[in-house]
Structures are given as C-alpha cells and as structure tokens.
C-alpha cells in the first residue's frame, strides 16, 4: 500500500477512535483502499465517491484520498462489518440506503 493510502487510513482511524460505537476499535488489519474510477462509471455506483465491501474501500479518484470525511465514512462501514458481518450488509436489503442506521452512523463521523 502506498504512503498516501496508508496516511488516509490512519487519519480515518484516528477520527473513528474518538467514537465508541463498538466494543473494539476499528482494525486496519487487511484493510485496503483501491482507486477504481471505472467502478464509479457503472450505473449503480455513479452516485457514490466511495464504496466499502468488507475490508475493501474503493474511491472514485486518487484526490479523494485527501477527503478525510469520505475515508472515515467508508472506514466506519469496515468497522461495522468487523462487528456485524452478516447483519450490516443485509440491512441494505431490509431498510434500503436512505433510512439505513449504518449509513446514519457512518455519516456522523
């Protein structure tokens, strides 16, 4: 992982460490950030600048690595998955995106 990605993750972790959402702090072990502009050209992803799936964070452009709010938001989703690996993704099927409590939690960081 390059230095810019490592710094972005550590800044986001420091921001999340100020919150006590879960019993254990977010772990960066195995977490990766990928800059994948092509992904965000796909219809489902066009509305996002970042996206998380388990231990992977995808961002639209390299410049977004400097967006501490975005990276912290996506890392919060990783943290949620570390504690609720089944419930968290299923919540999007049950309540959708707009009313999802995990989205509200991530938006609060």
Name each model feature, range by range.
Residues 1-4, 95-97:
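Active-site rim elements
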Residues 2-57, 107:
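Auxiliary, metal-adjacent structural segments of Zn-dependent hydrolase domains
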Residues 10, 19, 73, 77, ...:
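Histidine (H) residue identity feature
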Residues 20, 24, 69-75, 88-92:
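Aromatic-residue detector
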Residues 42-47, 53, 65, 69, ...:
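Post-HEXXH active-site segment of zinc metalloproteases
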Residues 56-76:
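Polar-ligand-bearing catalytic/cofactor-coordination segments
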């Amino acid at each position: 992982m390059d230095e810019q990605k490592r710094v972005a993750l550590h800044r986001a972790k420091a921001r999340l460490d100020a919150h006590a959402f879960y019993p254990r702090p977010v772990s960066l072990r195995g977490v990766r950030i990928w800059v994948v502009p092509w992904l965000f050209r796909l219809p489902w992803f066009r509305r996002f600048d970042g996206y998380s799936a388990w231990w992977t964070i995808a961002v639209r452009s390299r410049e977004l690595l400097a967006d501490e709010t975005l990276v912290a938001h996506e890392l919060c989703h990783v943290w949620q998955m570390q504690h609720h690996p089944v419930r968290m993704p299923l919540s999007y099927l049950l309540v959708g995106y707009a009313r999802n409590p995990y989205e509200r939690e991530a938006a609060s960081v």
